Amino acid sequence: METIQPVTIERDDTRIEGATLGGALHGPVRIETEGRPVAMIRYTNGVLSGPATYFYPEGNPSAQVQYASGKLDGKALFYYPDGKIQREAHYAHGVLHGVSRTWLADGTLLEEAHYRNGKLHGVLQRFHPNGCLALRQPFNAGKPLEAAKRYTDDRRPLAADGKPLPRWKQWWQSLANPSSA
């Protein structure tokens, strides 16, 4: 029966502490540079498995993710250096699957996208820094279902030429097609 053996590897300023089972990393592994944590990860028989936390040089987490069979799997959080959430994404078997959101450093939502098996599936929305909708486009299995609808930061639709639609024209179109207003 094989036993778990502690292992420490040092090279220059980097130190890796963990354990091996049958010669493969097994269990929690801590990686440090100059005495500061770089990553805390977990292995099962040499394969990334379970929770992992990565750190900025200052010590704050830069990412908290989950692994299964060596691939990202589950909720992943990515942080700004000050600790605020920059991105939340969901993975299944190493590809995006589920809702993904990205925020600006001030906490304003910048993008919300839905994925299925690594492809956009559902509505993609992007926002201006003031929080107003900038783009909206539905997708099915990675393919756009219609052209993106784009908006100015004061909520006016953009015409095909990229210029804001005049308010009178926007009003007129809303009368002709109330469901698109």
Where do the PLM segments sit?
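Glycine/tyrosine- and acidic-biased, solvent-exposed loop/turn segments at the edges of beta-strands
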Residues: M1-A181
